[in-house]
UniProtKB/Swiss-Prot annotation:
Active-site residues annotated for this sequence: E240, C274
GO molecular function, one term: lactaldehyde dehydrogenase (NAD+) activity
Subunit-level organization: Homotetramer.
Family statement: Belongs to the aldehyde dehydrogenase family.
Family annotation (Pfam families): Aldedh
Catalytically driven reaction(s): (S)-lactaldehyde + NAD(+) + H2O = (S)-lactate + NADH + 2 H(+)
Protein name per Swiss-Prot or TrEMBL: Lactaldehyde dehydrogenase
Matching SUPFAM superfamilies: ALDH-like (SSF53720)
Keyword NAD: yes
Pathway(s) this gene product operates in, as recorded in its UniProt entry: Cofactor biosynthesis; coenzyme F420 biosynthesis
Source organism superkingdom: Archaea
Gene3D superfamilies recorded: Aldehyde Dehydrogenase, Chain A, domain 1, Aldehyde Dehydrogenase, Chain A, domain 2
Amino acid sequence: MFIDGKWILREDLDILNPYTLEIIERITALDREETKYAIEVATENKDVMKELNPSKRYSLLMKIAEHISSKKDLFANTISVDVGKPIKQSRIEVDRTITAFRLSALYAKELRGETIPSENEIIFTKKEPVGVVGAITPFNFPLNLITHKIGPAIATGNAVVLHPSSKAPITAIYLTKVIEHVLKKMNIERGVFNLTTGNGEIVGDEIAKNEKINFLSFTGSVEVGELISKSSYMKKVALELGGNNPLIVLKDSDIELAAKSAVKSKFLNSGQVCISVGKVIVEEEVLETFTKKVIEETKKLVLGNPLDEKTDLGPLITPESALRVEILIKESISEGGELLIGGNRSNSLISPAVLNIDEDNILSKVEAFGPILPILKAKDDEHALNIANNSKYGLQAGIFTNDINKAMKFANKLEYGGVIVNGSPTFRKDNMPFGGIKKSGLGKEGIKYAVEEMCETKTVVIHNM
């Protein structure tokens, strides 16, 4: 809907407030031909970005960060209305976004090749942009996850085609207005950045398949990620997908700290986080104590209006999502799971649920993407390790222990892209490498690592000089 520096404004798609279920905006839904046009515009302008020197890319990114910083309250409120995230969590997302743009700016000046030793030739490498980056983003972090794609893309001199989730595109529209303003002030062709709103089956599908997209960065479900992987036509891809992330609690750990961490990280954004705790695996000697503390902490949580400062959990993104979670809880119970607290649904709201399950239960196998905290018993640390690794996913894992030898054992043997010791798998810093193995994804995010992914290395050999 923002293509070649122009806004395409229609009322094709109703966007609902997840909490009130009222229409907050009617936006443009691009068709396939319009999406192709956006990609063509980015292709025509990729040399504009390539020719921007690192200092100008740095300035561009820093100015975007400055403008967001000057509109913190606007962006935080927009996130909360857009996706139902509690306002105190939305403010954290805005701060992280500012940091991510500033990190991207710093790495714009850090693109370096190397010199290759040779007796008779001069051989060196140089970093060049891939050309056009397609960014497909989910609803759950509608500002920061966009930044993790477009920040490195701009830093490396690429043109961008952004497609935000059709469930929550309003934050992306506000961000695009900031980028439009900065590009205009810096006299940079606005066709270097294009926003494509609409249905993923059309817009996202075209971005994934179009051969003029040189690099595709996607965050979303495993099912869609697998389809993209099969249809990406040899383009470079980074897929940040889902998981069932284990949190392991050994008997020698600080049980109170582990319980508080499990509850806080599981119910962040109502469990709609790709690195949310999928299950807690607890050594049986401390299972009762841990479970009791988890229930105590869960009872303290406030469910309600995301704009209320007291709210800890807001709604899920749609009533259908809440219904899916409710059905998943019932399925778990039918398989022998014991519901200890919560699980009550009203429209898009669902109260935080804690269940006791065994390792064959559905909640031990799937990504719930909702406020469900399953707890499993392990006979010993080896059993806990086996349960954790018995998964098709491999995004992040957490382990609580006060034994450094056990910490290192789990760090080495857990089959996950990241292992967090004495913390939950939900931990993430914007400058650390982030990405899973197995069905949880391909490639790495994190500003520095995304910058590396969005470059090509060119080798230059000079003879007879």
